[in-house]
Amino acid sequence: MTRQSTGPDAGTADEDPSAAGRDNGQLNRSMILQTALRIVDRDGVDGLSMRRLSEAVGRDPVMLYRHVPNKGAVLDGVAELVLAQLSVDSTDPDWAGQLRTVARDFRQLALTHPNVVPLLVTRPLATPLGQRPPGMLRPLEDVLALLISAGFTGEDALHIYRVLFGYLYGHILNELQEVIERPEETDDVLRLGLHRLTITEFPQLRALAPALASYDGAAELDRFLDLLLPGITATLTGRDGQPATV
């Protein structure tokens, strides 16, 4: 199983996010969210509380509530900060190539902020579409613009977005489980476990043991895109070579 570096730069791993977040300047929403992101990156979502956040920015907790109404708003803001780093070029004439780039960039962003991934997956579901922060909606808007400008209908563009990001969420959760939740499961340990399976009962798993033990998240993602993008083109492209409604 190929292990990949995840999380913030190892060179700053021992820094106290509380110390890093203190600032003598005027308190504002951006400062609060940046500090919250550092805490989540280091200690996970469970390590973030309004009290700890107030200590990190060096202000009384009451001051925080002037800028963020509650912890839920902070979590939304943290997800928004990370998603703001995902760039979608909605003017790219190569819509398939742009979607491939977006998918790869999203994966890398998730590996950089693994503790934020649960927020990226769950916070939008917990917030009605019309009440989500603008930054949380930006990737959706830009992907829709990319596909609609390429000639797809709005409904088809929305369907493509849902298929792509639905897979991305599942893919990155699976990859992070492999490299973070079970770091002790080395290639040798996994192979040993697979070879202990009864070959008469699990012949396919036994046969695929080498592939299962050499999981490569980047290669898995590219394989999915190689299947998805031509399929979309074949299904939605008419004889004239232009996108057509399903």
What are these regions (language model features)?
Residues M1-A56, P69-D76:
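Basic, helix-initiating cap at the start of DNA-binding domains
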Residues L81-L86, H113, V117, H171, ...:
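A short secondary-structure junction motif
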Residues A126-G151, E155-R162, L173-N174, L192-P203:
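Amphipathic alpha-helical packing segments from all-alpha helical-bundle domains
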Residues M1-D16, S149, Q177-V246:
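C-terminal peripheral helix-coil segments that are non-catalytic and often amphipathic
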Residues M31-R38, R42-D43, G72-D89, T101-D105, ...:
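Alpha-helical structural segments
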Residues S87-L129, P134-R138, Y161:
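Hydrophobic alpha-helical connector segments
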Residues L164-G170:
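A short structural micro-motif
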Residues R59-V68:
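Short hydrophobic/aromatic patch on the recognition helix
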